[in-house]
Every structure is written in structure tokens, then in C-alpha cells.
From Swiss-Prot:
This is Tryptophan synthase alpha chain. The active site is at residues 49, 60. It holds the Pfam family Trp_syntA. PANTHER family: TRYPTOPHAN SYNTHASE ALPHA CHAIN, CHLOROPLASTIC, TRYPTOPHAN SYNTHASE, ALPHA CHAIN. It is an enzyme of class 4 (lyase).
Length: 268
């Protein structure tokens, strides 16, 4: 959990925002997935947001659903995902690692056992996409018991009560939603979110990272100009994996070429 605080303090000192890529663990297979994560970090990723393949991803658009299907086709299980997380943590001791997932996966293990396992492999945060703030008590309590930051989504239409709850219960960072709907690079992020960012700051919320529809450096810059601490990009990255599925080396090169200007856009 402290890795986020350390990261945001360091970035603030350098007058930089965070660039955070999202990928699905095990897409398109375990070995290549680990290489992808190394490539993202080498190219400048400040933190990682990782999905565990799940059969019914509600908030995901077709791009990320396909990533899940590819991981399933490779026979990737949640147990293997945790093994991967352990390997990633060993190799990269300081980078914040966040999971973005669905409640069924947490229930399958048992809530407390799930967060205990996260702590054991070195996961810093968990966002359970289909659990609203008002139903989050058992999740966030287990998370905090195991030194894992509970992450909450702040939608563009959040009212004062919701903003207060998010600020009060969230740790690590706040997932600031560019817009309602499903994920996807086609649906470009619509700003301004300045008023939300200002309110979150007023209530001392964890630093906001803007996600959904972030696919170009100008959007990263716009998010940071609006006061966000950084930006999360998922579908645009997963699409690169999809497009170069039969050219593993080229895939890694194209991913790096995508991440470098996205990271550069975080520097004011």
C-alpha cells in the first residue's frame, strides 16, 4: 500500500504525473504476459493495473473481453495469476501493483483468504469493479487487515455523498472515470473533470488516476492538467497485444513505442 504513497511523492517532486498501463494477466500466455509486463515497466510505466481473467467481465468492452478469452484459451487460472504476481513482485520490488477484478473471484477464495493471498504475493491495491461503495465494507475491511489498498471508482456524475465516501474509504489512489459505459479506446475520454478533482482534494481522497478511453498522449496531458495525478490506459495497450499476437517480439517493441510518449506526456 505504501508503494503508492512513495510513488506519488517522488512524482510530485519531479513535477510528473503517473502513467499506469492495464493488461490482463496471462494474455496471450503466461511467458509472453511476463515479457509484456517487463516491457511496459522498461518503457516507463509508473505502476501496473492488472486483470485476472474472469468469465463475465461486466465493465469491459470487447477489447479487454478478448484478452480474457485469450488467457482462458492459454489455460490460465487464478492460481497461476497469483504465481505470476509473485514473480513480477520479485523482479520489480518497488512498482505499485494493482488488481482490477470482479467480486466472484474474491468470493471463490473467501474474502479474507483472497486479500491474504494478495498481501503474500505483494499486491498493493485491489479494485473490485462490480462492488459499489455502499456494499464494500467486507472487502475494504479485509483489504486493510492485509495491508492492501481498497480502490474505488469515482464516476463523472458522483454526488457529494459518494465523493465523501470514496475519500473516506479509498486508499492508494482513486480511479477517476472519464465517462460512464464500458472500457475502450474508441470511446475517447471526455473532460473536464476539474470540479471532481477539486472536490476529491477537498475531502482528502487518495490521488485520482483517470481511466477509461485514454489512448493518446494529449489525453494523458489533459488529465494531469485537470488535476489528476496520472492516467490509466488499458484498451489501447490490449489492442496492441491483439494486433501482434503472432509476432511476439514486434509486439513488445510496439508496446514500448506506445508507452514512451504516454509517459513523456506526464512531464509538465
Amino acid at each position: 500500500m505504501e508503494r503508492y504513497e512513495t510513488l506519488f511523492a517522488r512524482l510530485k517532486e519531479r513535477k510528473e504525473g503517473a502513467f499506469v498501463p492495464f493488461v490482463t494477466l496471462g494474455d496471450p500466455g503466461i511467458e509472453q504476459s511476463l515479457k509484456i509486463i517487463d516491457a511496459l515497466i522498461e518503457a516507463g510505466a509508473d505502476a501496473l493495473e492488472l486483470g485476472i481473467p474472469f468469465s463475465d467481465p461486466l465493465a469491459d468492452g470487447p477489447t479487454i473481453q478478448n484478452a480474457t478469452l485469450r488467457a482462458f484459451a492459454a489455460g490460465v487460472t487464478p492460481a497461476q495469476c497469483f504465481e505470476m504476481l509473485g514473480l513480477i513482485r520479485q523482479k520489480h520490488p518497488n512498482i505499485p501493483i494493482g488488481l482490477l477484478m470482479y467480486a466472484n473471484l474474491v468470493f471463490n477464495k473467501g474474502i479474507d483468504e483472497f486479500y491474504a493471498q494478495c498481501e503474500k504475493v505483494g499486491v498493493d491495491s485491489v479494485l473490485v469493479a462490480d462492488v459499489p461503495v455502499e456494499e464494500s465494507a467486507p472487502f475494504r475491511q479485509a483489504a486493510l487487515r492485509h495491508n492492501v489498498a481498497p480502490i474505488f471508482i469515482c464516476p463523472p456524475n458522483a454526488d457529494e455523498d459518494l465523493l465523501r465516501q470514496i475519500a473516506s474509504y479509498g486508499r492508494g489512489y482513486t480511479y477517476l472515470l472519464s465517462r460512464a459505459g464500458v472500457t475502450g479506446a474508441e470511446n475517447r475520454a471526455a473532460l473536464p473533470l476539474n470540479h471532481l478533482v477539486a472536490k476529491l482534494k477537498e475531502y482528502n481522497a487518495a490521488p485520482p488516476l483517470q481511466g477509461f478511453g485514454i489512448s493518446a498522449p494529449d489525453q494523458v496531458k489533459a488529465a494531469i492538467d485537470a488535476g489528476a495525478a496520472g492516467a490509466i490506459s488499458g484498451s489501447a495497450i490490449v489492442k496492441i497485444i491483439e494486433q501482434h499476437i503472432n509476432e511476439p517480439e514486434k509486439m513488445l517493441a510496439v508496446l514500448k513505442a506506445f508507452v514512451q510518449p504516454m509517459k513523456a506526456a506526464t512531464r509538465s
